[in-house]
A protein has these predicted regions:
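Alpha-helical transmembrane segments and immediately membrane-proximal extracytoplasmic
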Residues: 1-425
Length: 425
């Protein structure tokens, strides 16, 4: 009897702090998730309008240099630390110093809408993540949180922003845990990340926003031959991810030769507008969602992925705003579709594998990308997706679109000396 009473006493003593912890983060996750989900809904609706307006008024692409100058001026004179984008969020989670300035959210929103409206090639994930991180961290200031909780709030923002932009709460939650350190997960944020991702995704949907649906119609039995082909294509997807990441660094370095930052996007806008005019197509600017969808049923040209890499990395490198992930989907899906001409796997499956594998290689988040594939395409191709994501992650090397990522576990023993360094070092 005495033992039973002691057990009841210890249950109350040990579980009460956990209950309080759950209530605290449930409140903060619902609050921040609702705000971020609403912000993401506004972003997605705005980008849909910008895309439709541009496609019906193609003359507006000629004004891309003007938009570039406006974006450059905004960021040069008002952004401050917010100009570092996603890398700033990663740095603050790893080594917290300051509250993320709220101005990051409206600046990246305006910059992204202008980029898409006037014909830049960019995505939306980076915008959603930055808006999410900036919005969530304002509650750190409001409630006077400790440094540890400040880190968790930024992680909440990343997860909620990602989940609501793509409608993938599981992938969004894990992405916020996996993206900070290469090869390691940050489990201290697991509860608030999952809660905020779920709430943000639901709120975004409640605003009437519909996400794109993709269909992998045929999934063969995973025999040895099919899995070997998956590994082979995973290598190619990893190399494509490496090319994408290094191209952004290259164009960014080239742009820095122009001493006055606003002129970088001005001149870059001139180049992009001229290239679109000479090619006579808008296929490689904007999000490219129609081409991504078509890749699952129609074989794409072998050079489509290369041109999207060129247009997107140049757009981001010279200072336009937006994410890189949707263009990465384009790169992977079109490359997978083109490979169906020589690889004996269904076109839709190859497009789906490429969709998530290039993303995994460029962001160093193979688990989140595998979950995203399962959320988007269903569980049936899960084994193929997982293998390709891991292989692409390995073969992309220590590169990535987030250069502030810390190498926590090197991808190969030969690179053990890089442990503890960032991708930029």
């Amino acid at each position: 009897m005495k033992t039973l009473r002691n057990q009841n006493y210890w249950w109350k003593f040990e579980q009460l702090p956990l209950l309080l912890y759950l209530c605290k983060w449930l409140f903060l996750s619902v609050l921040s998730g609702a705000c971020i989900g609403s912000a993401s809904a506004l972003l997605l609706v705005s980008l849909e309008w910008a895309t439709q307006y541009r496609e019906h008024h193609l003359w507006i692409i000629a004004l891309l240099p003007v938009a570039g100058l406006l974006i450059g001026l905004m960021y040069h004179y008002w952004a401050g630390t917010a100009s570092r984008g996603n890398n700033y969020l990663i740095e603050e989670i790893r080594s917290p110093h300051d509250i993320i300035p709220f101005r990051m959210a409206p600046l990246v929103y305006i910059g992204t809408v202008l980029t898409h409206l006037f014909g830049g090639s960019a995505g939306r994930e980076g915008t959603g993540v930055q808006m999410g991180g900036a919005i969530a961290d304002q509650f750190s200031r409001l409630f006077r949180m400790r440094r540890r909780d400040h880190r968790l709030m930024v992680a909440i923002g990343i997860s909620a922003g990602f989940a609501s932009v793509f409608g993938t709460p599981l992938a969004g939650a894990v992405f916020g845990l996996e993206v900070i350190v290469v090869g390691r997960m940050r489990y201290e944020a697991i509860l608030p990340s999952f809660l905020s991702a779920a709430v943000a995704s639901m709120v975004c949907h409640a605003w009437g926003v519909e996400h794109t649906h993709y269909v992998v119609s045929e999934v063969p039995f995973p025999d040895a031959s099919n899995l070997l082909w998956t590994i082979g294509t995973g290598i190619l997807f990893g190399l494509a991810a490496m090319l994408f990441s290094r191209s952004i660094s290259f164009w960014s370095g080239m742009a820095k030769r122009i001493s006055y930052p606003p002129f970088r996007s001005l001149i870059g806008g001139l180049v992009i507008a001229a290239a679109v005019w000479m090619m006579g197509t808008t296929k490689y600017i904007g999000l490219g969602v129609p081409t991504i969808v078509a890749s699952f049923t129609e074989q794409q040209m072998w050079y489509d992925f290369l041109l999207k890499i060129l247009f997107t990395t140049f757009t981001i490198g010279v200072g336009f705003k937006g994410g890189e992930v949707t263009p990465l989907f384009f790169v992977g899906a079109t490359l997978g579709s083109a490979l169906s001409a020589v690889v004996p796997l269904p076109m839709g499956l190859l497009a789906g594998i490429g969709f998530v594998a290039v993303f995994a290689g460029a962001t160093n988040t193979p688990i989140a990308c595998t979950l995203m594939g399962i959320e988007l395409f269903g569980a049936e191709p899960g084994l193929y997706l997982g293998i390709a994501c891991v292989v692409a992650y390995l073969f992309s090397g220590h590169t990535g679109i987030y250069t502030a990522q810390l190498i926590g576990s090197p991808k190969h023993l030969a690179y053990s000396r890089r442990k503890g360094k960032t991708l930029a070092e």
